[in-house]
Amino acid sequence: MSKYNKILGSIMGAAVGDAMGAATETRSAERIKEDFGGYVDKIITPPSDCFARGYDAGTVTDDFSLAYFTAKELVASKGNVDAEAAKRALFTWASYPQFFRFAGPTTEAAIKKLKGEEAVNPKAYIAADNLRATNGSGMKIFPVGLINPGNLDKAVQDTITIC
């Protein structure tokens, strides 16, 4: 398989997986079976009780869109990863209300801090009792693996720089 097809497949897999998961986010496997009559094996319209409510079936959320804008910036910078490229990607992503509405508390606080605004977030002081935590870094970073195939040390360093 060509490098192009591997990269395209990675990007498409992430986008489709995000669009499929938008309707089930935060649900347990048991609840998914209850709510949808079994496991979800196609793209469906997100119900009114999830983060993606109001979106059409097939729309991506912050999970893919953060990675997409990170990838675009990596391409624009010809694979040179630095803090400024990371900021540009994050600020561009945040300028799209349809994606920024999904921003988790750590991503929102990071954007405010990078803009020089006070990043007080009351959610950060509440103990998480729902077995969930934010994962803005994890969901946006797969493009770093695409530009560093076989070079784990560089991928780790680029991940640290971006996140």
Give a label for each model feature.
Residues 1-163:
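Structured, active/binding-site neighborhoods that engage oxygen-rich ligands
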